[in-house]
Amino acid sequence: MLKKHPFITKDELERITKKYPTPFHIYDEAEIMRRVRLLQKAFSWNPGFREFFAIKATPNPTIIKLLRDLGCGCDCATATELVLADACGVTGSNIMLSSNDTPPEDFKRAAAQGAIINLDAGGDMLDTLDVALGGVLPDSICARFNPGGTFESANGIIGNPADAKFGMTEAQLFETFRVLRDRGVKVFGLHAFLASNAREQDYYPKLARILFELAVRLHRKLGIHIG
């Protein structure tokens, strides 16, 4: 487990409060940049890699612009966040809409901005997307997978996907991708979020294995390309 250490001393904070009244948030710009670059270096083997920052985590325009300048995209959950991403200069496929119970207006805005749409469900949500876009689906669509059960690391259970309302079962995902394939979608993406605030070192390797193995099954059964 990673240990957290303050990046500023008590004396420095007291000096800052003499100029800026509390409450306020303070960020370590240099450390943010260092960590983003470390992440990008770790995935440099993949020339198509891009980190998408979840705006809901810190909807701060200064932070979003800093991450934009470092090559990051934005993960949005609402129309408001889509507007914020656009206002911060993040455009097109550098934006992803990952939402639940999405209204048609959000789908319309995402499509107008050229964002990648990440479906949380098929069925009614797919129907809503279809109506919102006038029956013309984008060439690329992503979908969220929920494998169910529990998600364990070396330190024990860190997530309970079976209890989460987000994402599709494998059967639902296959059916949704089959429908999308038959409707002309060319490139498919996979997304999964199985635990909040996961800091265990084996979380992402295990999650990556789940998604890569699922991608192989989807390709073999449906003949689709997981981009």
Question: Model-flagged regions — what are they?
Answer:
Residues 1-119, 123-139, 175, 180-182, ...:
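A charged N-terminal "starter" segment
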Residues 147-227:
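Active-site loop/helix belt of alpha/beta enzymes
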Residues 54, 140-146, 191-193:
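Short beta-strand segments
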